[in-house]
Amino acid sequence: MALLSEEDVVYLKKEFSEKLKENVKIIFFKSEDACMYCKETKDIITELLSLSDKISLIEYDFDKDREAVKKYVVKRTPAIIVAGEDKDYGIRFYGIPAGHEFTTIITAIKNVSNKTGNLTENTLSKLKEITKPFNIQVFITPT
């Protein structure tokens, strides 16, 4: 069953064909045990893959592929990493990317493909001053 409307499919195919320059890897971590939204998340990813040949999938089992879990520092499932062909930008989505999160994952795919972001020059300048690793976490609720 399709999760995206036909209108959304047409829009996203056009958007991706016009705006994706470089290949993007979706790295998906699932778990066979106790993963409430792994199936639905995989269904969304499968639909995204059908929209552009510049998007590919690498899939891991959180419980079995422990080296990959360690390499990508994955904390829970379902987990989606949006990465470039040869670079992991640290973008992680935990849980199902539905609602407002779907728009965010589309933006992440476009930004990774174009090796850009939406940061101002001033913000980029300030970020260059940071000398220690840090972790930004954004929590979203539908209310």
Kindly label every feature range from the protein language model.
Residues K54-K87, L124:
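Thioredoxin-like thiol-disulfide oxidoreductase module
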Residues L4, Y37, P78, P97:
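Catalytic cores of large soluble enzymes that bind and process phosphate-bearing ligands
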Residues K39-T46, E67, P78, T103, ...:
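N-terminal, well-ordered alpha-helical segments
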Residues A79-G117:
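Non-catalytic, surface beta->alpha helical segment in thiol-disulfide oxidoreductase systems
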Residues M36, S56, F93-I96:
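Short coil/turn segments at secondary-structure boundaries
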Residues M1-K25, E101-P133:
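N-terminal leader/targeting and pre-domain segments
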Residues V10, K14-S52, K128-T143:
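Local sequence-structure signature of Cys/Sec-based thiol-disulfide redox active-site neighborhoods
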